[in-house]
Amino acid sequence: VFLAVALNKVTSYYTHTAHAPVKSLTKACTTGHATNIIEGIALGYESTVAAIVVIGGAILLSVLTYAGTPPMFIAYGVAMAGIGMLTLTGNTISMDVFGPVADNANGIGEMGYDPEAMEAARPGSYRRARQILADLDAVGNTTKAETKGIAIGSAVIAAVSLFSSFIAVIAVGSEDRIGMMTVEQY
């Protein structure tokens, strides 16, 4: 659960319009194409490193929690970290749906508004409505990115768990003898 929350925070930092990475990318966009590409690639690499550190920390924490036990218990602990992430599936799916809903609201707003009629009725209302829809779209994009981070994080944890099981079977020769495996064999 802590891994999912940490991945949400990291992803939000790198994708939300209020934080420094997006602001620096916006500034790079104003200076030219080359700086925009360089800044975008640099931010992509930086955000990847942050996510890897968070996922690696979660795996290390689960390994340290089961330290001193047989290797299969350690692998079980890593698998439980993945199960803990999947307990938030309902939240993740509802956050994932918010992005397309915000996009649809923006599209309906673009098709349904008559700028001249709105400005005649209430001056400045069209500009405010467009800004609200743009903000809603930005939040939708951020939540979509956060859910992708959770999906990737749980996939990494599952892959580590499956790989450790594969190594265990290869090391002892059969599934029946995994319980007798020692750390040296692993």
Segments predicted by a language model, with ranges:
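Hydrophobic packing and interface segments
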Residues: 1-186
